[in-house]
């Protein structure tokens, strides 16, 4: 599996990098949480902008992005607008989504931008090109909150995301049996072994899939989301547990 380095953080090599989400409604609460999370043992902070009550206000977006960058220092900042169709709080029109991504890219504050794969097929080349021109890495994401596709389908989806030019394909699926969790792990290992052009981020959601968030170094998932107090997705494990298990399972 290849790796990318951002702000000295090597994603795709060694211990999976830990991401902490910020899910807050107001500018003050977002920045207060950012200051709290900046002191914790994690590599990256994700701003879930779909939770922000003023997300349609471009000036408010810019203020939050600037405040986040100041609060986080050298921690990585991932900016995500998760649409309702992909498990988020709300949705935007295609133009609103493009405007949001544009604000993130030109702000100079974000290190990574999440771009959803399925809702944005036609716009993906332009969105990814804009991000790369601004020096922002792209996480291309896909979520299934109902089931786990076959291993073949998951690998096909991840390789399709690679082919968009995204830096980090991300796949999150819902297991309905232990075998589903194994399928996700097998697909992850296949990507690392047979399609190593980019690092990937994968997870099996819910309590049943929680183990997948802890064994990324073994199977090939480059980053994992931890719960710093309020989870942004089902099955996120508490930060102290994540760090303890990642250290225990380290291959180095």
Cite the ranges covered by each PLM segment.
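Short beta-strand/loop segment at the start of cytosolic alpha/beta domains
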Residues: 1-7
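Active-site beta->alpha loop and helix N-cap motifs at the rims of alpha/beta catalytic domains
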Residues: 3, 14-133, 143-147
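Short boundary motifs at domain starts and secondary-structure transition points
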Residues: 7-13
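Catalytic alpha/beta core domains of metabolic enzymes, predominantly
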Residues: 102, 112, 117-252
């Amino acid at each position: 599996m290849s790796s990318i380095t951002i702000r000295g953080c090597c994603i795709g090599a060694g211990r999976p990098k830990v991401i902490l989400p910020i899910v807050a409604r107001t500018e003050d609460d977002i920045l207060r949480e950012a200051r709290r999370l900046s002191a914790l043992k994690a590599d990256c902070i994700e701003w879930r902008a779909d939770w922000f009550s003023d997300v349609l206000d471009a000036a408010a977006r810019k203020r939050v992005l600037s405040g986040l960058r100041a609060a986080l220092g050298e921690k990585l900042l991932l900016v995500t607008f998760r649409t309702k169709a992909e498990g988020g709080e709300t949705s935007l029109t295609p133009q609103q989504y493009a405007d949001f991504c544009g604000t993130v890219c030109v702000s100079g504050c974000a290190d990574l931008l999440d771009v959803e794969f399925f809702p944005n097929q036609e716009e993906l080349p332009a969105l990814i090109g804009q991000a790369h021109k601004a020096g922002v890495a792209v996480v291309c994401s896909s979520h299934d909150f109902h089931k786990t596709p076959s291993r073949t389908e998951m690998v096909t989806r991840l390789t399709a995301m690679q082919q968009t030019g995204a830096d980090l394909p991300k796949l999150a699926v819902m297991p309905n049996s232990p075998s589903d969790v194994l399928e996700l792990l097998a697909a992850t290992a296949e990507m690392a072994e047979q399609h190593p052009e980019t690092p990937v981020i994968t997870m099996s959601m819910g309590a049943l899939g929680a183990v997948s968030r802890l064994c990324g170094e073994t199977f090939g998932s480059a980053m994992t989301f931890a719960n710093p107090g309020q989870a942004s997705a089902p099955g996120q494990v508490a930060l102290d547990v994540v760090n303890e298990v990642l250290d225990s399972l380290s291959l180095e």
